[in-house]
Amino acid sequence: MSLRLPALFLAAAFTATALADEASVRRGVEARFDGIKVDSVTKTSYADLYEIVVGETLFYTDEKVNFVFKGDIIDARSQKNLTEERQQKLSAIKFEDLPLDLAIKQVRGNGKRAVAIFSDPFCPYCKSLDRALLRQDDITIYTFLYPILRAESPDKARTIWCAPDRAKAYYDFMLNGREPAAGPSCNAPVDKWLALGKKIGVRATPTSFTTNGERILGARPEELVKLIGEAQK
């Protein structure tokens, strides 16, 4: 026991010091930038920098808050973008918390892989992503209509949602430009779509989420397919 006490003491002392340093940096940032509210401070493992998160913004500073750096930090040895990796983790969600009953569901093959995509009916990049994903089998795609691009986007989203076959209406319109067949009027959950997107920070379309909660911005099908596969492992 006597041999373990010093190690435990040192670990506790190190943790306390780290927490004290992070608290000091937090106070320093908030003092330097009057009115700013820091969400988190984390000591990084590189260059004695501290990671600062304010809302959706991530930047770095030194212990004394004399310098601030906003941009990407690249590990020259591995060529990894450390900032991008960290932002991916910070922007992750719990996939199981998504209200999938508000999404258009399409199952291909056994549907064992899954992805959720926020899409505007008039988004050209959404159409490009939808077309690229046609080549994927054994996948379930949950499409949340997110009508934010045009004034007519909400009406088009309503028409698609109220169609007799939502998935067919959506893909016919996105891939072939076919107008959705007129269906009976229904209460399309436009307000719920918009509230959901705002809640999880969806700012543009397409925005996709894998089952492990990772967020992918834009039409990047190759990267998305890779991440979808990794999420299922």
Show the residue positions of the predicted features.
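Bacterial N-terminal signal peptides
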Residues: 6-15
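Short strand-coil-strand connectors
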Residues: 55, 211-212
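Mechanochemical coupling/switch segment within NTP-driven translocation systems
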Residues: 160-163
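Positively charged n-region of N-terminal signal peptides that target proteins for export
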Residues: 1-5
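Extracytoplasmic thiol/disulfide redox context detector
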Residues: 17-158, 172-175, 179-205, 221-233
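Conserved, helical-rich catalytic subdomain that frames metal- and/or nucleotide-binding sites
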Residues: 167-171
